[in-house]
Amino acid sequence: MPYWVYSPHSGGQKPKPAVQDRIRARILKHAAKNYAGKYDRIDVRFRGALCYVDAYTKSSPDPWRLVRLRYNGDENSMTFAFYTYSHEKYEPSCFADGSDHGTPEDAFDIGALYLN
């Protein structure tokens, strides 16, 4: 008999445009405050329930893929996947405190390791 298992890295819901704007603004404000000079431009884009965050630098014509956030109805409790260049895909991850859910800013901090 099949059984159901909770996965924080599946499903989700598409955030409304106002929520998308707030999430984008939060990420950009956090990046400008804490990582100024380490990137030229941060790109935040949405596709369905997912929010992709990339950074552009002068040293590379291609973007640095940082993280992919998943919106589950609460912009303060999102899940995320870290982009691994060794496998060239997003891998589900947990936040620094071990939780599956956290803020967009906390997810950006983890992805920003590529900016150092």
Where do the model's predicted regions map?
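Mixed-charge, Lys/Arg-enriched low-complexity segments
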Residues: M1-R22, A81-N116
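Negatively charged, low-complexity tracts enriched in Asp/Glu with abundant Ser/Thr
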Residues: P2-P61
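Short, conserved beta-strand/beta-arch hydrophobic-aromatic motifs that form part
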Residues: D54-F82
